[in-house]
Amino acid sequence: MREYAIEFIGAMFLVLAIALTGNPLAIGIMLMAMVYMGGHISGAHYNPAVTLAVWMRGKLKSNKLFGYMISQVLGAFAAALIAYVLIGKAFAPSPGIGVAAWQSILVEILFTFALCSVILAVATSKKLEGNYIYGLAIGFTLAVGAFAGGSISGGAYNPAVAIGPMIFKSFLGAQNWNNLIIYLIGPFAGGILAALAFRYLNEK
C-alpha cells in the first residue's frame, strides 16, 4: 500500500503543478522533486505509460501493474479537484488550435518515448545503479518535452494527466472526451516503444 500511496501523491503534485502553473520548467522541477521523494519506495512512476514500460522491463510485478495505474489516475483526479477549488477553473490537456489528431499523437509518442527511455536508463540500468542524477535527468526530460510539444499536443506524455482531470470535468458537465484517444494512444505507444528499444539496446 505504501507504493500506491506514493504513486497517488506524486501524480497529484505533478498534475497540480501542470494545472496551476502551465510552466514547463516548474512542471519538470516538480517531477524531479517527486522522483527523489518517492523513488526509493515505488520507483516514482506517476505515469501509467512509465509503469507499463517498467513492467515490460521486468522491474515491476504484474500484480502491481493496475494498482499503480489506478493510484496515478486517482492522484490526477485529486489534483484537478484541488486546482478547481483554488482557481475556479477545470483543467484538462488539449491539443493546440488547428493541430491534427495525428500530429498530437505523434508528439505524445515521441516525447513519451524520450521520457520512458531516460527513466529506464537512469533508474533501472545496472550500469547506473546508485546514481544521484536520475531525478534531474527525468525532470528535465519532461520539461523539454513540455516546452517543445506543449503547443502541439498539450504536452501530457502521461495518460493520468488526461484521464483524471477529464473524469473530474465530466462531473461538472464540461468535458469533451474526443481528445482522450490522443492521450491514450500516444503515451502508451511511446512507453511500449521505449521498453522494446531498451531491451534491444541495453543489457537485461
Where are these regions (language model features)?
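Membrane-interface helix-loop junctions and terminal tails of multi-pass membrane proteins
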Residues: 1-204
